[in-house]
Amino acid sequence: MNEALVIKKSTALTEELLGVLLALEEKVFPSPLSREALRARLGDRKGLVILVAWHGDTPCGYKVGFEDSPEVFYSWVGGVAPQYRRLGIARKLLDEQHRVVKSMGFAYVRTSTKNKYREMLLLNIKAGFDVVGVQKKLKEVEQGILLEKAL
């Protein structure tokens, strides 16, 4: 990566930003979220924070979350495009998210992941998250691992 990485923050879901998130979803996940699913989940969220990492004109990673309660920010989804992995981008997005939400007055960040996303689980633990529980969703075989960090 010769060009500097730039992380841009947004607190509103515009159509342009939705397009960027969709493109990243398709690169990051085998079953990406749809435009409708993203819009439904994020459209009117209180405390919405969307971070996109850019390498030049190319979006290469993202991290999205919102207010879960007045003290708790929920880090909902994020990822890094495969060709940009192992360059520290996920950690930079995580650190920036925590800096931003702490400045917004949140005391905790909460997230969840699955056992199959080992790199994300390890990143969160290395960043100071504690495992606080597991949850079983009816339509999913695998349990979710709940994590929380005091800011």
Over which residues does each language-model region extend?
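Conserved N-terminal entry element of GNAT/NAT acetyltransferase domains
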Residues: 1-16, 149-151
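Short, well-ordered beta-strand micro-motif
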Residues: 52-54, 146-150
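Conserved acetyl-CoA-binding loop-helix of GNAT-fold acetyltransferases
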Residues: 80, 86-99, 126
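Conserved short alpha-helix immediately C-terminal to the canonical SAM/SAH-binding motif I
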Residues: 93, 117-120
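Conserved catalytic-core motifs of GNAT/GCN5-like acyltransferases
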Residues: 110-114, 125-146
